[in-house]
């Protein structure tokens, strides 16, 4: 929290001279944005970081309630999470290629099987597909952040519970966001 979203707010202020920002959060970035807004809403008046630092927030494909995570839920259980946390502990992060593989499996008809059939079996040239470029532009996920995200949000669905998650020692509540 302090080294990610809040440090970004400081960097924006330093670069632009503006104290407040408009934020867009996409996918996990949206979940982190919502968490940050709840953290800011919990800060007392006069704190270094307060809710007035963010003027507006726009969310794209963002989950805050993980009770029905869709296809991704197939990949999140205690056993898988333990293996993933063990793997991430070795390097301190999850390689971006792992995230790409999960996205490929979620869109297997578009991202795997259509290429097997059309390119390998039928010998056709692959068509341009913008999702392939997006999926190959991956990001490493910091181990501590990603482990907390998967465990506390996906597995335990704590983000929707007031005080279910504490960031930098502060319990957060999404309902407090204005």
Language model feature labels by segment:
Residues 12, 46-48, 170-174:
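Short, flexible, glycine/charge-rich loop motifs used to bind or transfer phosphoryl groups or to couple energy/partner
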């Amino acid at each position: 929290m302090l080294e990610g979203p809040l440090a970004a707010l400081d960097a924006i202020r330093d670069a632009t001279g503006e104290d407040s920002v408009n934020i867009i959060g996409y996918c996990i970035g949206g979940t982190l944005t919502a968490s940050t807004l709840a953290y800011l809403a919990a800060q007392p008046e006069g704190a270094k970081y307060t809710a007035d630092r963010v003027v507006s927030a726009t969310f794209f494909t963002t989950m805050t309630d993980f009770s029905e995570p869709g296809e991704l839920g197939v990949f999140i259980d205690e056993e898988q999470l333990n293996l993933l946390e063990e793997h991430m502990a070795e390097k301190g992060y999850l390689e971006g290629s792992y995230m790409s593989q999960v996205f490929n499996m979620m869109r297997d008809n578009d991202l795997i099987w259509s290429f097997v059939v059309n390119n390998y079996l039928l010998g056709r040239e692959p068509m341009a597909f913008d999702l392939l470029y997006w999926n190959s532009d991956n990001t490493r996920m910091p181990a501590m952040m990603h482990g907390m995200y998967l465990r506390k949000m996906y597995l335990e669905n704590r983000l929707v519970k007031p005080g279910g998650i504490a960031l930098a020692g502060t319990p957060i509540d999404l309902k407090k966001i204005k």
